[in-house]
Amino acid sequence: NILGEEDDKFWHDHKGASINAIRNTTLIKNADILIVKFGDQYRQWNAAFDAGMAKALDKPIITLHDNKLNHALKEVNQAASASCRSVEQVVNVLSYLIDGTLEKQSLNVAE
């Protein structure tokens, strides 16, 4: 623990969140594009917060999530420059942004 041990879980989490906020804010400020991946667990709240920060900093956002989260993330997707449902779509968007490549890329990823 960087800031020392805590017996109380609240203060343990508070200290960790404070350090993470510094790290995440710095990384987002230095990013050209933010790719935000949402899942089924509580961490999607952190992802939504990071997306909001990126939007406030006028950073382009690409979201990545399953179709079952479409409704829950409709406002986040509206704020994003692109909303993807697969890693392959994210790669295709980035390929187009970086070198103008429009042809579909094929990934050899173990599922």
Where are these regions (language model features)?
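Conserved catalytic or regulatory cores that recognize and/or transform ribose-phosphate-containing ligands
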Residues: 1-111
